[in-house]
């Protein structure tokens, strides 16, 4: 098992990835609204492993949608003013 942290612009970082990942942890600037584009790129580039998850960190004042770019929110955990929304790729019948 290994972890790779890629700081910087998400679009450059995502296009540099050459293998599927089990977990993506998105910690963008909170108010910038990058989530939809990040999810789209991860899906379009087939970067997430079959049973992988995306964890999107955000503030409590942002309601993340239940479905986003083909991914479905399966859990949400609150820690003070921060929320972790956990997504996995939706099934075809959804």
Residue spans for each PLM region:
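Class I S-adenosyl-L-methionine-dependent methyltransferase catalytic core
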Residues: 1-94
């Amino acid at each position: 098992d290994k972890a790779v942290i890629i700081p910087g612009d998400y679009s450059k970082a995502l296009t540099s990835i050459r293998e599927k990942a089990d977990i993506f942890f998105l910690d963008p600037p909170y108010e910038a609204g990058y989530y939809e584009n990040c999810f789209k790129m991860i899906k379009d580039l087939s970067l997430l492993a079959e049973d992988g998850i995306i964890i999107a960190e955000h503030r409590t004042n942002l309601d993340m949608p239940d479905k986003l770019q083909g991914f479905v929110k399966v859990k949400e955990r609150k820690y003070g003013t921060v929320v972790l929304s956990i997504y996995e790729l939706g099934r075809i019948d959804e």
